[in-house]
């Protein structure tokens, strides 16, 4: 793609848009701040950022974003979900059981257990929220094996096994071995830190706060062919 990719920055009212817009612009995107759901058409890339509560994101879906985002997710345009933008791909979250997400990915969003043990390096008790730098294990060239990214979250995405699959457990698979889990991180337990399915990439961490690794990821996302995302 020779010209700067025309990139929709979806405004769900969840904050941090300016930081994401700056990072995308620095990575080579032609960023369009999108506050109207009906305008989500004809873009080269779509980015759905967010920090805050699942309930607030679900309210934005009910206010008009649900249908356009589902249409985009079923299309061919590469889409990047960040933090709450990843969690909203699921139907429900323990953070707000009454709120309804997109239900595009199978499973639900769960809270980290209260007792996560101790940090193996410092011996200090691991806390919730999980806040700070963490390393990824991944086979994705976009994400980068061993790269460190910045996380701030109390909830993680737990992918559900497909009916009839041989995944362990009755209904919920070990998300770190689910085919859609593109990267794993560890905070007292292994959890899925990124999802990839077709042109969709969703990350629990914040690329815009992750310095060189985040900038590299955004550049790769903007340059990648749709099927490579």
Identify the meaning behind each predicted range.
Residues 5-28, 207-208:
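N-terminal beta1-alpha1 ligand-phosphate binding loop
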Residues 30, 45, 78-80, 148:
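Structural signature of beta-strand start/N-cap positions in the alpha/beta core
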Residues 40-50:
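Short acidic/histidine-rich motifs immediately flanking catalytic phosphotransfer sites
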